Amino acid sequence: MIEIKNYQENERFQHHFNVIRANAPVSYGGLKLYNGKRDYLIQSTNQFAATLCYLEEYFKDKGVQYLEIGTASNLTNSMIWNSLNIEENIILDNLECPGTAESLVGNLSFKQNTVLIVGDSTQDTIKEKVQALGYKYNLMLIDGNHDYEYVTKDFEYYYRFLSNDGLLIFHDIDNDAVPGVRKFITTNPILNTNFTQCANFIDNSNYLNKNTFGSQCGIGIYKRK
């Protein structure tokens, strides 16, 4: 199982860490204070730096067809875009997260071959739009509604669009504030029967107050067996 420690001496890890730290809020290990807008990167520094290193190592220069469920400020999407060769960038979001409009529009503006589908990812109309695109994705991030029922619905519908060699990422697998994700990854029979966890990026260091939301997070990366 790949962990954060596998990358911490890596030059790329330090690069990603520095960029994430500059754009993430203090409660996530970053340097930003709240300014009334949600224009910050909603990622824990060490965890996401290790994730980007893993993805770069896995895909190298290969073209990536990426499906992102939940985008908020779109900064996670931008970090992945800047790190990989994204050929198709499909994003689902209901746009109900407040204060993200300026960051979302600004970040979307420079990404060719991006499709933003607005709506609830669990609704039939949205599912039909994704199906109509006809893509198979070799990278998929499930980071929308974190309630157990919604994570289950997102996974059990969209995993069928994952290619055989594709990677599936879950955010907040170790976050007590949103326990539905942890419950899902430990109990879902389809995930546990058909997928293997390749990477477990959970940060147990003490540089953050463990009562803060972003200090927990946790990122899990899975691949079909």
Where do the model's predicted regions map?
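N-terminal auxiliary segments of SAM/dcSAM-dependent transferases
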Residues: 1-17
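S-adenosylmethionine/decaboxylated-SAM
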Residues: 19, 23-25, 29-225
